């Protein structure tokens, strides 16, 4: 089985241009492809993870990845799939985020002489002259076609700014530049990027008279069609300081039964034959598959030691309902107490079990918070310092998410 057929079997491919040519190219290890990452935060997320694993799979098959850091396009903001305009970041923020991305990518992709390369589109986009850009590529874009593009659909309903409207042109120009200066002949991206990617292949065809290729990755959604990679409204980060290895493990351990095999196929490097065996499991036996999924992904992102710790902690907590040394914990300080007490709402927000005080109130009202073995029923519930003595107090959200508070 070639790498193209494996990507198909794993359910990773959504749309492609020139399928037979792409199949032949990637199976022969002759593709030089790029995937772009806009620097909207100081860490990559679980949402980026599938793109990183795709780059790794294709590199292992002999193809050369180009990791494009969007230092320039981030200054505009990608409107794809958005109902609001993205927050404008400063150049300093974008440069800092780009450095964070580079460090994280190096854990997945093999960079170096003759291997993967990393580029930043700020190096060419920030120096563009507007008049020269219009003269060079403006005639290659149809406004009518751009307005019909799916990537602008939701923003058109709320009001698409001219700033965002230029994003497709900038992304297309990236492909044009990479094709000319780096020999990059293929672009990969999320399925919501299809229109932008076609803009790039068309620009190359019209300006250079040559073929370039595009292929989109299936978006990682759950059985209800919602994008995966968030918990309690917060992103699941690859940075261990933003999402602990234990919380990362727990996110994947708690996926719905209907999603576990799909996640194995799309995100792990487990052999398809092994995944097929897990697919035979039903009922409570599916927990074995979930544990395997969580372990594999935690090992990929955080290493074997952290995966082992997370597995041990999760088993201890679920089996005994007790305290594990590797359970996520917060040491409370004097600043957290008012008149010697701390509120249940503050505990939920401090532990990130709830993304906001409003969400914390809703969680308590819906009976979703336990402190020790007792359900917290009052939104004004408080705890005195004595509650956190010794091994501390374990707070539980729902059935599966734990956090320990100590002094």
Predicted feature residues:
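A charged helix-plus-loop insertion that forms the helical arch/lid used to bind
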Residues: 79-95
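N-terminal catalytic cores of NTP/NDP-binding nucleotidyl/phosphoryl-transfer enzymes
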Residues: 21-79, 187-194
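Buried hydrophobic packing segments
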Residues: 51-58, 178, 196-204, 297, ...
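Short acidic, glycine/serine/threonine-rich loops at helix termini
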Residues: 77-81, 128-134, 226-232
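Positively charged, low-complexity intrinsically disordered leader regions
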Residues: 1-33
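Conserved nucleotide- and phosphate/pyrophosphate-binding catalytic cores
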Residues: 204-407
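Divalent-metal (Mg2+/Mn2+/Ca2+)-assisted nucleotide/phosphate chemistry catalytic cores
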Residues: 10, 90-91, 97-218, 222
């Amino acid at each position: 089985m070639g790498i193209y057929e494996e990507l198909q079997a794993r359910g990773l491919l959504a749309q492609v241009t020139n399928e037979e040519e792409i199949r032949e190219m990637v199976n022969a290890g002759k593709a030089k492809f790029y995937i772009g990452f806009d620097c909207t935060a100081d860490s990559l997320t679980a949402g980026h993870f599938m793109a990183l694993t795709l780059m790794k799979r294709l590199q292992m098959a002999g193809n050369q990845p180009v990791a494009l850091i969007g230092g320039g396009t981030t200054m505009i903001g990608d409107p794809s799939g958005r109902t609001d305009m993205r927050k404008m970041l400063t150049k300093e923020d974008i440069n800092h985020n780009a450095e964070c991305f580079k460090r994280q990518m190096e854990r997945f992709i093999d960079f170096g002489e003759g291997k993967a390369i990393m580029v930043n589109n700020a190096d060419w986009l920030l120096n563009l002259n507007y008049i020269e850009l219009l003269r060079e590529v403006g005639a290659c874009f149809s406004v009518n076609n751009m307005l019909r593009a799916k990537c602008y659909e939701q923003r058109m309903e709320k009001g698409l700014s001219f700033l965002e409207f230029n994003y497709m042109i900038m992304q297309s120009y990236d492909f044009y530049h990479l094709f000319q200066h780096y020999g990059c002949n293929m672009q990969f991206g999320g399925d919501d990027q299809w229109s932008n990617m076609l803009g790039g292949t068309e620009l190359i065809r019209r300006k250079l008279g040559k073929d370039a290729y595009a292929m989109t990755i299936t978006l990682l959604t759950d059985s209800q069609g919602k994008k995966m990679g968030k918990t309690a409204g917060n992103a699941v980060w690859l940075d261990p300081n933003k999402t602990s290895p234990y919380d990362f493990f727990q996110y994947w351990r708690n996926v719905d039964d209907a999603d576990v095999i799909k996640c194995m196929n799309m995100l792990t490097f487990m052999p398809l034959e092994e995944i097929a065996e897990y697919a035979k499991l039903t009922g409570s036996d599916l927990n074995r598959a979930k544990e395997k999924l969580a372990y594999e992904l935690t090992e990929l992102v955080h290493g074997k030691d952290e995966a082992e710790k997370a597995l041990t902690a999760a088993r201890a907590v679920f089996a005994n309902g007790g305290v594990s040394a590797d359970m996520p914990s917060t040491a409370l300080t004097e600043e957290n107490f008012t008149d010697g007490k701390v509120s249940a709402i503050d505990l939920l927000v401090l532990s990130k079990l709830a993304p906001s005080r409003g969400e914390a109130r809703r969680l308590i009202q819906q009976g979703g918070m336990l402190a020790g073995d007792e359900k917290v029923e009052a939104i004004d519930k408080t705890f005195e310092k004595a509650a956190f003595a010794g091994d501390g107090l374990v707070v539980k959200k729902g059935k599966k998410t734990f956090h320990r508070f100590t002094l």
